[in-house]
Every structure is written in structure tokens, then in C-alpha cells.
């Protein structure tokens, strides 16, 4: 299990709350919406470790009991009349109708948002059915929308896998960008004797890293800024996103961190080469050598297509060791490949993921699996809804 102190080292904990937003960012409010059991568990996890002051976590579910125990500052019971707070029973149509019934409440909660990140586990009732509706509402209020989703374990059966695929296709029509997290591949990074609880926790951790990685880019001021307009421009290439987070310590740590973020045995054939836009955000000590930083930027330019638009951002902090570098890379505009698999991925700074404080390690790109390798919504527990 990941302890809070470890997560803070990964910049998800209290330290991130104390950061002061870039004044130019003011008004670009971020709302993170967890949908169903899986998404709500991610919100719980996010709240436990702390979020930036400009990020509002919202938990939504048709299961009233599960929602009641969530620490989110904003909670919305979907379909109070139609479901009675008893869940969607694994039926997406019920989840969809529940979200439509609660549309006004959802709209009110996100009306001031400039960026809405919606997270869920596909394959069940609430997540699969309600998420596309919530994303559409976010688009209606004028927000940039990013969907971060998981898919069912292969062993959960064809019906659940089919529901997940249908839900994903619907999300493709409405989201500005989609990040699909392959939980079967996450399990490959776990110790062989890892408990069920550790594995489920791991899925939540990866979801939190994805949310934190995106929000960090525009909530932290730096010498070289990537602002909300840059993120909006990058995500304007509607489709699937590739995301990596890497860390390294020592000589050439900036370049090593980048390599950790874009290279992994789990990446298969996915790379940043096919992207149309790339955002790279470095975090390091103020006295980190400029030459090393420059070489890392050159390395990324060499890896990307010559016509790709690459934007670099930089945040410095005295709290980061002088030879340590953390990098977040978001590549957008990728299409799903011929076997139906997407290029979405999320990198973690260690192996296995449950040890996020390891200073130098292989970044683990977790790519959406092939049609035969579908993965888990954070569910199985009570997350079927």
C-alpha cells in the first residue's frame, strides 16, 4: 500500500496544495468528476492525498451508500428518483437515464469550469452509461473535456467488454481527448504475491497520477510556462492521448527522466512519433544545469515528427533535490491503431508502481491493450455500478 508521505514525494500530496497558481491561470478552474464506483474511488483517493486549491473533486454515483462514504467536497446522487440510490445494476441505459435526470445538478456543479476531467471504469452500468452524458454537459458549459477511463479484465467476460467498447465509442464522439488506462498491464508491474487490495489500490494510484499530471501542468508557475491555452490547443486534436510521467536522479537526469517517460516494454508499438501536438513539463531545482535541460529538450525534438508542435514548460522548486528531475509528457492527436487498440498510456516512475519514491527507474508506459487484452474498471468490489 502507498503511504501518504510517498505520494507527497510524487507531488500528489499536501505539497501540491501549497503551490501558488500562475496569476495568468486564474479563472481556468479545473473540475475532476468521478463517475460510478470506480471513478468515485479515484476521487476518494485524490482527496485523501490532497489536491491543488484550483481543483474541485466531484463524486457522482447511482449507489447512495457508496457515495455517502466518499470524502469528496461535492457529491451528486445520480437518478435519485429513477434508481432510488440503489445503483444501476450493471445496466448502462439506467446509468444514462440517471445522469440525464440529474443533468441540472451536474451543470450547476461544473458551470464555472474551464477544464473538466471525467474518470470512470467502463463496463458497468453507471460509469458506462452516465459518463458520456456528463461529458456532453461539460462541453455544453464550454469546458475542455478529458476522459480518463479503464476497461474490464479479460476474464470478466465478453458482455462486459462489449459494454466497455460501446461506452468508449460514445465517449469518442464527445470528449476532446481520451486517456485509456490498461489495468491488466498495471497488474504486470505488480509483485507476484501482491494482494487484491494492493492491486485495486494501484489502479486508483495510476488514475490519480493521470489527473495530477494534467492539472499540474497549468496550476504551477514556472520560468517557462505552459498555460491553459497551450493545453487547449494541444487537446484540440480530438482523439486519443498518450501520457507519460518519468523521474530520474543523477547525471543527465533530465534526459533519463524523458526516456523513462517515453520508453517501456509495456509500450509495445506506441510512441510519440505519431502525435500531432506534444506538451513537455519539467520539474526540477532552480540550480539544475541549463545544458542538461537543453539536451533533454533536444532529445524529445529528435524523437518526435519534424512537423509536430512541441511546447515546453518548466517549474522549479527548492524542495526538489538538485540532481532530480520529474517530467510529464502529453502527446495528442494519435488515432486508434488497426487492431482496435489505442495509443493512450500513462507512465509511472518506478517498478512496480507501488513504490513511487524510487529515484531512478524505468518509466512504465501502460498502453490500452489489444481487443484480446481488455482490462479492469476499478471495480469488482462494488464498482460494478
From Swiss-Prot:
Bilayer-crossing regions: none
Record has Calcium as a keyword: no
Intrachain disulfide bonds: none
Gene Ontology cellular component terms for the protein in this record: cell division site; cytoplasm
Entry-linked Gene3D superfamilies: Tubulin/FtsZ, C-terminal domain, Tubulin/FtsZ, GTPase domain
Pfam families from the UniProt entry: FtsZ_C (PF12327), Tubulin (PF00091)
Compartments reported by the entry: Cytoplasm
Coiled-coil portions: none
Main location: cytoplasm
Function: Essential cell division protein that forms a contractile ring structure (Z ring) at the future cell division site. The regulation of the ring assembly controls the timing and the location of cell division. One of the functions of the FtsZ ring is to recruit other cell division proteins to the septum to produce a new cell wall between the dividing cells. Binds GTP and shows GTPase activity.
Self-association and partners: Homodimer. Polymerizes to form a dynamic ring structure in a strictly GTP-dependent manner. Interacts directly with several other division proteins.
Name the record gives this protein: Cell division protein FtsZ
Protein species of origin: Helicobacter pylori (strain J99 / ATCC 700824) (Campylobacter pylori J99)
Amino acid at each position: 500500500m502507498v503511504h501518504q508521505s510517498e505520494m507527497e514525494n510524487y507531488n500528489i500530496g499536501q505539497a501540491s496544495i501549497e503551490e501558488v497558481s500562475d496569476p495568468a491561470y486564474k479563472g481556468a478552474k479545473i473540475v475532476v468528476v468521478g463517475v460510478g464506483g470506480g471513478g468515485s474511488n479515484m476521487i476518494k483517493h485524490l482527496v485523501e492525498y490532497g489536491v491543488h486549491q484550483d481543483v474541485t473533486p466531484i463524486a457522482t454515483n447511482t449507489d447512495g451508500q457508496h457515495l455517502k462514504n466518499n470524502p469528496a467536497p461535492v457529491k451528486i446522487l445520480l437518478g435519485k428518483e429513477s434508481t432510488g440510490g440503489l445503483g444501476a445494476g450493471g445496466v448502462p441505459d439506467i446509468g444514462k437515464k440517471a445522469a440525464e435526470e440529474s443533468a441540472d445538478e451536474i451543470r450547476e456543479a461544473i458551470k464555472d469550469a474551464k477544464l473538466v476531467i471525467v474518470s470512470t471504469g467502463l463496463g458497468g452500468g453507471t460509469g458506462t452509461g452516465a459518463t458520456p452524458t456528463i461529458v456532453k454537459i461539460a462541453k455544453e458549459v464550454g469546458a475542455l473535456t478529458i476522459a480518463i477511463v479503464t476497461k474490464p479484465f479479460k476474464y470478466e467476460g465478453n458482455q462486459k467488454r462489449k459494454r466497455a467498447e460501446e461506452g468508449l465509442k460514445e465517449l469518442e464522439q464527445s470528449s476532446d481527448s481520451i486517456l485509456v488506462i490498461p489495468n491488466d498491464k498495471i497488474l504486470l508491474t505488480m509483485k507476484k504475491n501482491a494482494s487484491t487490495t494492493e492491486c485495486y489500490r494501484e489502479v486508483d494510484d495510476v488514475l490519480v497520477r493521470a489527473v495530477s499530471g494534467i492539472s499540474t501542468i497549468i496550476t504551477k508557475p514556472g520560468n517557462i510556462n505552459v498555460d491553459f491555452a497551450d493545453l487547449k490547443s494541444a487537446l484540440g486534436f480530438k482523439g486519443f492521448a498518450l501520457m507519460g510521467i518519468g523521474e530520474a536522479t543523477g547525471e543527465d537526469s533530465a534526459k533519463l527522466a524523458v526516456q523513462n517517460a517515453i520508453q517501456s516494454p509495456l509500450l509495445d508499438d506506441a510512441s510519440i512519433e505519431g502525435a500531432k501536438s506534444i506538451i513537455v513539463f519539467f520539474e526540477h531545482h532552480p540550480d539544475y544545469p541549463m545544458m542538461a535541460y537543453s539536451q533533454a529538450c533536444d532529445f524529445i525534438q529528435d524523437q518526435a515528427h519534424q512537423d509536430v508542435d512541441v511546447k515546453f514548460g518548466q517549474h522549479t522548486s527548492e524542495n526538489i533535490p538538485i540532481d532530480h528531475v520529474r517530467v510529464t509528457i502529453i502527446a495528442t492527436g494519435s488515432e486508434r491503431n488497426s487492431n482496435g487498440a489505442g495509443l493512450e498510456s500513462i507512465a509511472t516512475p518506478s517498478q512496480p508502481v507501488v513504490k513511487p519514491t524510487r529515484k531512478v527507474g524505468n518509466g512504465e508506459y501502460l498502453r490500452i491493450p489489444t481487443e484480446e487484452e481488455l482490462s479492469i474498471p476499478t471495480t469488482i468490489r462494488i464498482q460494478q455500478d
